[in-house]
């Protein structure tokens, strides 16, 4: 895992009312000061997360619960009606058996996407991984600061 340093800075975190989704609780925007920190230059991959699972026998939250939310376009159209969705966010479908190594449900696999970012990882799962990998999970503020790429816009590209 490679880390890159980010300098201290001030940025606007969150969105104005009417932007995004109220359920995300990201409004109103607030100015945040961030001290210098380091962040991984890529997200954790399926391969890296599998190494953690293999080494520890850890069971993820999605595996324990037995389901997780999948973006609707990753589910076969004829199966979409079978699954529950998030009120106000119909693009998320609650799929039984979806978890980190079965990203779109029990028939799916990560075999061909080992270098893709791991998905269906809860905060608890991420903290367990970071403890095992001896790295620090960025805070929400650090993550948003890094994701915005030093801009004041909603997205790094504008």
Give the ranges of each region predicted by the language model.
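Acidic/histidine-rich helix-loop elements
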Residues: 12-25
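Short aromatic-cysteine micro-motif
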Residues: 22-57, 85-151
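Short, flexible active-site-adjacent loop segments at beta-strand->alpha-helix junctions, enriched
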Residues: 10, 17, 43, 64-66, ...
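Acidic helix-start/capping segments at beta-turn-to-alpha-helix junctions
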Residues: 58-81
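An exposed tryptophan-centered "aromatic clamp" motif
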Residues: 150-158
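Mature N-terminal segment immediately following signal peptide/propeptide cleavage
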Residues: 1-13
């Amino acid at each position: 895992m490679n880390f890159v340093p980010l300098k201290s800075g001030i940025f606007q975190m969150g969105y104005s009312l009417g932007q995004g989704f109220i359920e995300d609780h990201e409004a109103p925007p607030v100015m945040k000061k961030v001290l210098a920190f380091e962040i991984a230059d890529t997200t954790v991959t399926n391969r890296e997360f599998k190494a953690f699972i293999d080494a520890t026998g850890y069971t993820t939250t999605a595996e324990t619960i037995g389901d997780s939310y999948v973006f609707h376009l990753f589910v076969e159209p004829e199966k979409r009606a079978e699954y529950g969705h998030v009120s106000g966010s119909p693009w998320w479908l609650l799929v039984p058996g979806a978890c980190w190594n079965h990203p779109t449900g029990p028939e799916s696999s990560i075999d061909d996407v080992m270098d893709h970012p791991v998905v269906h990882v809860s905060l608890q799962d991420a903290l367990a991984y970071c403890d095992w990998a001896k790295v620090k999970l960025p805070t929400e503020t650090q993550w948003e600061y890094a994701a915005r790429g030093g801009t004041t816009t909603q997205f790094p590209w504008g």
